Amino acid sequence: MKIAVTGGYSSGKSSVSAVLTTLLDCFFISADIACKNELQVGATGWQQLKELWGPDYFSEDGEVDREAVREKIFLDPASKKELEAILHPLAHRQIVDAGLRADVCDKHLVAEIPLLFESDQSYDFDMVIVVSVAEDIAISRAMRRDDVRASLATSIIASQLPLAIKEARADFIINNDGLFAATYSQILFFVADRIEKKK
């Protein structure tokens, strides 16, 4: 089974994905990690971004200035679209390849894709999990985890599809508002109800 894990900003997608990978015989891929890899010096995404934006967003040794890029894309919607137009197709290729490897090896695929519904890329998943969290909790967690200002966290959330729309498109919703023990119980139920029953 090919499973996508998505949700809002700082909702706990990585935590849910990590648990799933311990419970399932699966391959795992993260769209965020795939995109970060594409911004490593010399990678295809890095080359395309440097050609598009020039040297101002790169350090002297060629590294992408991630903080400067983050500020730019969330203050300038056009820049965000430019970056996504570079990275999303490259990440998509990696995710599709991971799915093919999973098929060959008769394993599940767990793919963490934060912008699954916002992306123009087409995917073929058997199950889409949306990790849901209240906006005030997401902002608080983002400020602790990413050391960002509340205003930036709010703008990131506003730049994505409303959570209600994501939930409406989900095959399964995991609420992560409270203690992670409650979240873990929901993941166990998902595995038992949506995967084990289908064997």
Curated annotation (Swiss-Prot):
GO biological processes: coenzyme A biosynthetic process
InterPro entries associated with the record: Depp_CoAkinase, P-loop_NTPase
Domain of life: Bacteria
Main location: cytoplasm
GO MF annotation terms: ATP binding; dephospho-CoA kinase activity
Segments forming domain DPCK: 2-199
Pfam families, A to Z: CoaE
Chain residues that bind ATP: S10, S11, G12, K13, S14, S15
Metabolic or biological pathway: Cofactor biosynthesis; coenzyme A biosynthesis; CoA from (R)-pantothenate: step 5/5
UniProt EC number: 2.7.1.24
Subcellular localization, as worded in the UniProt entry: Cytoplasm
Catalytic activity: 3'-dephospho-CoA + ATP = ADP + CoA + H(+)
Keywords: ATP-binding, Coenzyme A biosynthesis, Cytoplasm, Kinase, Nucleotide-binding, Transferase
GO cellular component term, pick one: cytoplasm
Protein family: Belongs to the CoaE family.
Role this protein plays: Catalyzes the phosphorylation of the 3'-hydroxyl group of dephosphocoenzyme A to form coenzyme A.
Cited HAMAP family: Dephospho_CoA_kinase
Protein name according to UniProt: Dephospho-CoA kinase
Organism of origin: Desulfotalea psychrophila (strain LSv54 / DSM 12343)
Lineage: Bacteria, Pseudomonadati, Thermodesulfobacteriota, Desulfobulbia, Desulfobulbales
